[in-house]
Amino acid sequence: MGPVMLDVASYELDAEEREILKHPLVGGLILFSRNFHDAEQLRELVRQIRAASHERLVVAVDQEGGRVQRFRDGFTRLPAAQSFAAINDAATAAQLAQEAGWLMAAEMMAMDIDISFAPVLDIGHVSAAIGERSFHSDPQQARIMAECFIRGMHSAGMKTTGKHFPGHGAVTADSHKETPHDNRPLAEIRTHDMVIFRELIQRKLLDAIMPAHVIYTEADARPASGSAYWLQEILRQELGFEGIIFSDDLSMEGAAIMGSYAERGQASLDAGCDMILVCNNRQGAVSVLDNLSPIKADQLTRLYHSGQFDRQTLMASSRWQQANKALTALSERWDAHKQTLGQ
């Protein structure tokens, strides 16, 4: 299995995509909204992906909830992470967060999708890229809700990906459009943003981590996603993380400072990433495959899902029906709340 995760253009594979998926450097594929028409079509697309590749790829999606939910029609409307903090009763909030993690994972695994890149562990809501994707502005409250969501995912059989290390929540710039700089003292990042990663790693709850395309100016001139300081010295050595490290999408503007697509990919792998994402630019992805040093990433097989869910059986279950009703209601209340704030 190779270290590159790619995307595909539409509802089904074309001939070029079938050939690309056979490349020895390809180890994963991420799906987007453009790949989804309905549940039956999605399941068939995943089947095509499995059939086209020599090895079982890690199939992924961003199905966080709120504004980042790639598959909507026919799937539960998942609430934004921040909405759980608006529930007055802490026990109810914790239970619902756990059910959200379970339900999201179960619905994805019924499509034979291995992972959703979740949860978001960024602290605070000022970032344009993060906002309501963050559970809370208080690190301990965020950790409590994230841990519940994670336990739900794990109970269903899906591995977790904490993002965006060491924390994207304090920068207003959107790394999809530019390279954000976080100029805060390193001590503040460590005690405010990084503590949630530290605690969840200590509890063995994170299977993978995705670093941020953010430059933390007191630490390194490179974004964390291409920084050996953050990925090896801090994440591996200091925090003792033994799971998978993903780059964020290298087509994002936040990664452009690292050079061409091939240079971005090599820099991220050299810095300590196990798998790199190259999406939304076919030419860039092919350039990475043509120029990357040969490398195996067999540790990625740890991310295969272990849940066995039939979609019809799942949706007929009382647990799914109760969770679906409660989570849909929370989503609607949260949207109404945002409207009163003019958001």
Swiss-Prot record:
Respond yes or no to whether keyword Aminoacyl-tRNA synthetase is given for this record: no
Residues the record annotates as the site (Important for catalytic activity) are: 174
Q: Which PROSITE patterns match?
A: GLYCOSYL_HYDROL_F3
- Tell me the keywords, alphabetical order: Cell cycle, Cell division, Cell shape, Cell wall biogenesis/degradation, Cytoplasm, Glycosidase, Hydrolase, Peptidoglycan synthesis
What EC designation does it have? Answer: 3.2.1.52
GO terms of molecular function: beta-N-acetylhexosaminidase activity
What Pfam families does the record point to? Glyco_hydro_3
**Catalytic residues of the enzyme:** 176, 248
Report the catalytic activity: Hydrolysis of terminal non-reducing N-acetyl-D-hexosamine residues in N-acetyl-beta-D-hexosaminides
The pathway it acts in is: Cell wall biogenesis; peptidoglycan recycling
Kindly report the protein's main subcellular placement as a broad class: cytoplasm
Task performed by this protein:
Plays a role in peptidoglycan recycling by cleaving the terminal beta-1,4-linked N-acetylglucosamine (GlcNAc) from peptide-linked peptidoglycan fragments, giving rise to free GlcNAc, anhydro-N-acetylmuramic acid and anhydro-N-acetylmuramic acid-linked peptides.
Q: Per its record, how is this protein called by name?
A: Beta-hexosaminidase
Q: Which gene encodes it?
A: nagZ
